[in-house]
């Protein structure tokens, strides 16, 4: 079967309905992963179909993903998004990508030169929490991170996203060019502030004058992104190939729902993403807190406790009334009360929509995938609501059970005695603690004492220790399904 390209798509109605030859690489995106393909690049594609804009995207993978970039090049930088509803699938061919680079396929210098080109107005990122080289508990730069150490020692040959951004801004400053906006699109609370803090701290260690120039001239808008995008599987790619009549190794499937809330703070212009459904606002924080706590927090709850309960996919957990009810109750009783939202926000309606999205059987979103990088996610998704309930003296049993589920998961052994492939930047540290205690409740205060995940105000709080210990003991004695059903 042929691969997707301009020539193989000429007989299809799915071609982008705008002139791709007029596009310029005005956006450089770091991290051509599944989420970006189904979200920001798709928003840009739909914006282009509704305007006469020339905002194209240069895609860059810094770590791995060489094959993806090579495939993208062979198919004229076209790829497919399959929006899978419960009963039907809509396939869209995305044409907003103009070119692509990879330091191991091209060169570090080629990447830096692209970022330094005068027409580049935005450098956006989906590099995950760990890509910011930040301490998850404080949000400040982790100066002991090997990538940070390497980039400070050899700044003209960067490895990290921070290193590339700071070096590219240095080049632009030296050439008298305007800077670009740095736009984080990662699922991290106040992602723009975290990106700014990390960039400024890194630049301070490298060149204090450059740091001051960046602070004065560069903007770091916060964004809230939402769309469930499972990792691509062979089944996904086969389905896309059957629908298209040609293969697309860059294809991705996702749910129909999408949301993008953007702080309107750009130093060198921006696309009119609002015509594609994005919202430009003055303050993103309430929206991202709503999403991180209600959606992502319950997603983590379902991931750890669902995996332990033998459920492979989030939609599988929704067939269990105990999990379905516990997820909704967690949203409404543990997370929603901790939020301060603009007037008129319907949190109950939002929670019901989330349950509907989680139930979509077409997505096959693996609990194991969502369970990755828990040490980075838990502070963002549960820390704020935990503080709220401690201050209010209210019930936080759902949060305690979610944290206990994570602790049981990172032990590396499931309820049948099989190994769990724990993927986490702190996996080795966590495994060592778990190995010292075995499946014993004594592990709880030890894991809560890891301040990179749990600040002392939470990890050493007797109420937190007691509640998490109680939930952990229930997981050992009764298993995940019974523990969830009892909530």
Region spans (language model):
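Substrate/ligand-engaging "lid" and interaction regions
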Residues: 1-487
